[in-house]
Amino acid sequence: MNSLDLPKPPHETRVVVAMSGGVDSSVVAGLLKREGYDVVGVTLQLYDHGAATHRKGACCAGRDIHDARAVAETLGIPHYVLDYEDRFRESVIDRFAESYLSGETPIPCVECNRSVKFRDLLGMARDLGAEALATGHYVASRAQPEGGRALYRALDPARDQSYFLYATTPEQLAFLRFPLGERPKDETRALARELGLAVADKADSQDICFVPQGGYADVIAKLRPEAARPGEIVDLDGRRLGEHEGIIHYTVGQRRGLKLSVGEPLYVVRLEPETARVVVGPRAALATRRIRLTDLNWLGSRAPDGLADLPVAVRVRSTREPRPARLSWNAAEACLEVELVVPEDGVSPGQACVIYADDGPRAQVLGGGTIRRIGALQAGAAEAA
C-alpha cells in the first residue's frame, strides 16, 4: 500500500486535490506531488459577493482562485476551475437563509461539505480518473480491519475540523483522504515555505465564506426581505420587555444586543418564528440536558436504531470540547436522542450535534445530526420545537 492506503505505486495513482487557494490545501497538493503522485488540482468557484470576495480571510472566490492557480503552476500540476455558483446558492446560501427564518442557527460549512464539495466534487474526481480526492481539512481517516475507513479527530486539537465533517458518508470516506490530519498547523506552514509556495503566510479562511464582515443578517435580509419582521422580546412568562427588528439578529444563548433595561442579565432562550417573538430568561434557563436529532449521518459499526443508553461524547458547538452523553433511539419518533451527563448552555436548533466514541483527543467520529428539539431544565423554558 502507498501512503494513501491505495494499492498502486504513487506514480500510477491519480489524486485530485480540492484547492481552495489557502495554505492547507496547497500543502496537500505539494506533498502529494513530491511523493510522486499524479496530482490534479480542482478549485470550485462558489460565489462572488462583492465585498466578500476581497475581504481578508474569505475563501472560494476571486483572489483565492488566482492563488490556487499560481500554486498549481509552481508545482507543475494541471488545475481546473469549476463554476458551482448556482449549486452553492441553492444548496447552501438559500438553505442558510431559510434556516434563520425558521428560528434556527445553521452551519453552512456542514451543508457545503455535504451537498457540494463531497458530493459533486467527488464525482468530478472520479470522472477525471482519480482514485482519491484529497483535501486540506484537519481531520483523520483510517482504514479499518473489517473494511472501509473511519473518521477521527485531528492530531492538532486547536485545528480539528471533525465537527464540520460529521455528515461525510461511509462511501465518501472510502474515496477521501486527509493528509493533514496527522500534522500540526505550524508544520503545515513550515512545509509551505519549504515547498516555495507563495501562500505560506496567507491568513486562514473564515467559517462563513460568503458573509462579508460577519454581517450574516444583512445577507439574509437581502435574500429574504421578510426576514426583517419586527416583534416582541418577552420573558419566560410571556411578559413584554421590549421590541426587536427581526429574529434573524438573535441566536440562543445571546446576551449582547438585547437593549433591555432590566435588573438581571438576560439571555435568548428560544426564538418563535410563528409569532416573531424572542424569548429571554436567566442563564439557568439555557441549561439543556436532552437533544433530539434529525438528518442523522451514522458512521458507527452498530446500527443507530438499536442503541439504548450508549455512553459517548458529543459536541453541540464547534468551539466546545466533546462532553459525556448517552444515546438512545426513539422508535416512536424514528430519531436519535442525546442525554447530556452535565447540562449545556446555549444549545440551539439548527446547530450540529457531533457524536464521538469518547472524549479523547483522537476519538473516532460516530456520526451526528441536526439539533431540532431540545429539552431544557428550567420549568419556564419548556421543550421548544
Swiss-Prot record:
Its main location: cytoplasm. InterPro entries: MnmA-like (IPR004506), MnmA-like_C (IPR046885), MnmA-like_central (IPR046884), MnmA-like_central_sf (IPR023382), Rossmann-like_a/b/a_fold (IPR014729). Its EC number is 2.8.1.13. One of its GO terms (cellular component) is cytoplasm. Gene3D superfamilies: Adenine nucleotide alpha hydrolases-like domains (2.30.30.280), HUPs (3.40.50.620), Translation factors (2.40.30.10). The keyword RNA-binding applies. Keywords: ATP-binding, Cytoplasm, Disulfide bond, Nucleotide-binding, RNA-binding, Transferase, tRNA processing, tRNA-binding. Belongs to the MnmA/TRMU family. Catalyzes the 2-thiolation of uridine at the wobble position (U34) of tRNA, leading to the formation of s(2)U34. This is tRNA-specific 2-thiouridylase MnmA. The gene is mnmA.
